[in-house]
Amino acid sequence: MNKRKVKNVLFIMCDQLRADYLSCFGHPALKTPNLDALAAKGVLFERAYVQSPVCGPSRMSYYTGRYVHSHGASWNFVPLKVGEMTIGDHLRPLGVQSAIVGKTHMRADLSGMARLGIDPNSKIGRRIGECGFDPYERDDGIHPYSGHDPEPAYNQYLRDQGFEGDNPWEEWANATVDDEGNIRSGWFLKYSNKAARIPDEHSETLRPSPMPVCSSRRMPCR
């Protein structure tokens, strides 16, 4: 491939987004105009299915193009074994630099690398630990348990934009406005340890749920 013809590709992967909760798929109340615009200008797949209800294995299927029972990463933090080719590995020989930004819930196959004599801190070892992608800005959002840098570069970027704090991601980017108009960070939001644990008084309502395009604090994007 001629490197001059290589184009940038931005692949956005949403976590826990149901297709039938998009107005372009016919939801009667929820309005998703920005996603609708993308669907209208592009290709809308009406019969596309994730390969696992668990997010990590499903991501590995996106990366490898294979079923969960084939790539073997059957749960969050189950390593994708050494030698498993991903889209990052396939694109690199074509002159494309591929990187992951955000979370992926994948851990390196340390035992596999040890068996093959690969240094986890080497260039190839770090790529294996990032699903075949180049290390960039990894943040699985579960500090300090993820084993990754608890002070990602994005936090310093937010401070440089004037969003001060010990953890600007939590205090500013991951913030919302409550019913009284007060700004609440993710630390104070309701924690539900099971999906859709909605209080009875809020379980049925005629008021459509808001789906903001960006943070109420007008977070800068990078």
List each model region and its residues.
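Formylglycine-dependent sulfatase
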Residues: M1-R222
